[in-house]
């Protein structure tokens, strides 16, 4: 599951290709509203020589939350310190990070929704008043110590906004929601990446990669690197649509960006369960995949593409899903997504 080339989760190779990341806000492609607003807030903070208000980046994985956080620090001309929610296991870990920050530095916490409640409690006064309240000692001899902190900017990133506690969420003065990218935006990202990597690419080659990238820059960059590998070995001088399509077919990434696992999921419901409805536990058992992987990794993109419906009775495939995988609609299924006729004579009776 973690080896999917179209998966949006971070992989080691994604971290190695840092040269593909934009370094300044003007080079960042997509998320126009977020970029424009951030540019205003950054300029205002610079003009006043103040720390930027705390920022929360929310959205699906792979859309550029970490990259944007690094750009914000670079545009502000301050240091950038990065960590993640699961790494900060106790209050002392957070205190060590905060006390080492210089004035107006940026502290980036990825997966901030995974902070423990004890660490969150320490974070509240640090965010609001730039003060750290720590308990020193145990039992009757315990005492509270208040530490003054340099003004700083906390940038949090989360893929699960609903898991953030209300007190923590409300302390971010600049909430930014990132959305999936349009194909045209991803084409720009692919062209820029090809230029950085020194790869010759035609416009239709960039389009072929972009339209299969599932609206996610991280996936686009990964597909670009793999297509480059095929082109290099096969002696292709310039990657056009034909070369890109050939490479992506060998990677089992189809024209919608679906991979072999997506096709297994769709065929499981279409063939084994006549298009549904079928429960997620049954699907998980049939595919030998954990339920959370089905719900959080496989299904979101299929639902976004209008191929799957989640209903109270279970998962159903839409007619578009049957058409995409080349399986005929079961008898009795209507043309409406996720609906079935109760009786064969429904249409004749005007109750389809």
Curated annotation (Swiss-Prot):
GO terms for biological process: DNA recombination; DNA repair. It catalyses: ATP + H2O = ADP + phosphate + H(+). Homohexamer. Forms an RuvA(8)-RuvB(12)-Holliday junction (HJ) complex. HJ DNA is sandwiched between 2 RuvA tetramers; dsDNA enters through RuvA and exits via RuvB. An RuvB hexamer assembles on each DNA strand where it exits the tetramer. Each RuvB hexamer is contacted by two RuvA subunits (via domain III) on 2 adjacent RuvB subunits; this complex drives branch migration. In the full resolvosome a probable DNA-RuvA(4)-RuvB(12)-RuvC(2) complex forms which resolves the HJ. Has 3 domains, the large (RuvB-L) and small ATPase (RuvB-S) domains and the C-terminal head (RuvB-H) domain. The head domain binds DNA, while the ATPase domains jointly bind ATP, ADP or are empty depending on the state of the subunit in the translocation cycle. During a single DNA translocation step the structure of each domain remains the same, but their relative positions change. Disulfide bonds: none annotated. CDD domains: AAA (cd00009). ATP binds at residues 20-21, 62, 65-67, 128-130, 171, 181, 218. Belongs to the RuvB family. Residues 182-252 are annotated as: Small ATPAse domain (RuvB-S). This is Holliday junction branch migration complex subunit RuvB. NCBIfam families: PRK00080.1, ruvB. DNA binds at residues 291, 310, 315. Residues 1-181 are annotated as: Large ATPase domain (RuvB-L). One of its GO terms (cellular component) is cytoplasm. The keyword RNA-binding does not apply. It comes from the Bacteria. It comes from Parvibaculum lavamentivorans (strain DS-1 / DSM 13023 / NCIMB 13966). It is an enzyme of class 3 (hydrolase). HAMAP family: DNA_HJ_migration_RuvB. Residues 255-352 are annotated as: Head domain (RuvB-H). Keywords: ATP-binding, Cytoplasm, DNA damage, DNA recombination, DNA repair, DNA-binding, Hydrolase, Nucleotide-binding. It is found in: Cytoplasm. SMART domains: AAA. Mg(2+) binds at residue 66.
């Amino acid at each position: 599951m973690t080896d999917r080339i179209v998966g949006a989760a971070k992989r080691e190779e994604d971290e190695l290709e840092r040269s593909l990341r934009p370094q300044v806000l003007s080079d960042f492609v997509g998320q126009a509203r977020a970029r424009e607003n951030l540019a205003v807030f950054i300029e205002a903070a610079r003009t006043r020589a103040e720390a930027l208000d705390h920022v929360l980046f929310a959205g699906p994985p792979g859309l550029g939350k970490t990259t944007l956080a690094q750009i914000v620090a670079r545009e502000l001309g301050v240091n950038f310190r990065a960590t993640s929610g699961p790494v900060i296991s106790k209050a002392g870990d957070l205190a060590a990070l905060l006390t080492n920050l210089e004035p107006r530095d940026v502290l980036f916490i990825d997966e901030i929704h995974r902070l423990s409640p004890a660490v969150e409690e320490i974070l509240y006064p640090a965010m609001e008043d730039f003060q750290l309240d720590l308990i020193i000692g145990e039992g009757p001899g315990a005492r509270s110590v208040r530490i003054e902190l340099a003004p700083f900017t906390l940038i949090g990133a989360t893929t699960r906004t609903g898991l953030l506690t209300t007190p923590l969420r409300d302390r971010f003065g600049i909430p930014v929601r990132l959305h999936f990218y349009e194909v045209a935006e991803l084409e720009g990202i692919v062209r820029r990446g090809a230029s950085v990597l020194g790869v010759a690419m035609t416009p239709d080659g960039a389009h072929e990669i972009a339209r299969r990238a599932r609206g996610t820059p991280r996936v686009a960059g990964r597909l670009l690197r793999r297509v480059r590998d095929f082109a290099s070995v096969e002696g292709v001088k310039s990657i056009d649509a034909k070369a890109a399509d050939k490479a992506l077919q060998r990677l089992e990434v189809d024209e919608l960006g679906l991979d072999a696992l997506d096709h297994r999921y769709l065929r499981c419901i279409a063939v084994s369960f006549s298009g549904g409805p079928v429960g997620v536990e049954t699907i998980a058992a049939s595919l030998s995949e954990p339920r959370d992987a089905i719900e959080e990794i496989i299904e979101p993109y299929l639902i976004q593409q209008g191929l799957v419906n989640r209903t109270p009775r279970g998962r159903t495939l839409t007619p578009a899903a049957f058409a995409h995988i080349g399986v005929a609609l079961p008898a009795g299924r209507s043309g409406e997504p996720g609906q079935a006729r109760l009786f064969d004579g429904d249409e004749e009776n005007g109750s389809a």
